[in-house]
Amino acid sequence: MSLEHILVIKRPLFDQIGAFQGFQPEAQRYLDVILAPGNNFFMARPDAEIDPSHKQIIPYSIFHHAGKYLVYTRGGKGGEKRLHAKMSIGIGGHINPHDEREDSLASTTYMNGVEREIDEELRITGRHTQRVIGLINDDSNEVGQVHLGVVHLFELDSDAVESNEESIQDIRFLSLDDMMRNRDGLETWSQICADHLAVA
C-alpha cells in the first residue's frame, strides 16, 4: 500500500495571515493566501499527523435543507480514529495529490477535490449549491493542532441523502435547536460550527 500524502500549509503561514481560535468567518482572506501557488504542498500523512509545525487543510462540509442540518454518528472504521462515536454535522476529508498533478493546489482544483470527497462519502439525490462560510482552528487538542478546517455550506433541494461509507452512520436532519440540545455529544469542530450557526 502506497504512503498517503495530504495537503498542508506551514504553520508560520497561518500565523502570518492571522492565527485564531474557534470560527473565523473571513474565509476568503485566508483562502486567497492558502491556495496561492506554492503556499500549499503535499506531505506524508504519518508525518503530518504528529507535526504541529504544519496544518492539514481539511474541507468540512455542512448540509442544509429546509431549516435542518445533516447530522450523523462517526462509525468505528476509517477516518480519524480520535473522533469515533462522536456526532458530527460535517463531512471532512483530506485532499490528496490525485486531485492535482502539480505539487500544490489552486482554488479550482481545491474545489474539485471537495466535490470528489463528497461524492465518495455521500449519495445526494437532487441538486445542491455550496459556498465557503468560514474556517475552523482548534489548538486545544491534538487533533486540532495539526488541522485547519475550511467550512463549506451545501444547500440541498432534497433531504434524500445516504451514506457511502461505514464511518458515516445514522444520518438524519435536525433543526439547529435540536442540534444545540445535543451539543455535548458533538465533536469539537461541529460544536464550533453549531455555535456559529446559532448566532449567524
Regions found by a protein language model. Name each.
Residues 1-168, 174-200:
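N-terminal leader/linker segments that precede catalytic domains of diphosphate-processing enzymes
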